[in-house]
Amino acid sequence: MNIDSLLAISPIDGRYSNKCTELQEIFSEFGLIKRRVLVECTWLKALAAEPKIRECKMTAAQVKAVDKVVANFSLADAQRVKDIEKTTNHDVKAVEYFLKEKLAKTFNSNTSNSKTQTILEFIHFGCTSEDINNMSHALMLRDGQKVLRGAMDGMTKIIAQMAKKYAKVPMLAPSGRPSPSSRPSPSEGRPCRRAA
């Protein structure tokens, strides 16, 4: 969906969007829905791995199918969640229904319909929407931090190289006002140490 940059919520998704493309997948609504799917699927697999919950036992093929839903999550999948949300009026419930719909198709070819239905009822079992949202937002922050950290590390290296390269070059008016000539001080390298 293209929007006019003048209608963007902030300059980050407007005029600077081409500089933040890596962050769009993470912090967009698509990114939130994708991470909700990841959290729900991880929880389902954890329940299936618990020996005391025999009703939720999944085959290796079913676990792979759950992993595949997460790995192949697409814009079309996110749109399907949004379509379901129009009926449910609940964003996290829409993710739950999407997963039941998606996994039912895969599971039914491998197991009996009643066994499939029992497993699918464990999606979101024992969770609140807040549980799913808290984890999803934490994953968004973690993934965003990885992207930003990489950019900051690159910038830090450039500043450190420039501080060394220009250490003996005199500067004129470093404060924007006439002053006696000076040289870059060790403080020019401090931002590098702070960012590291």
Show where each model-derived region lies.
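A helix-coil-helix interface module used to build multimeric assemblies
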Residues: 1-196
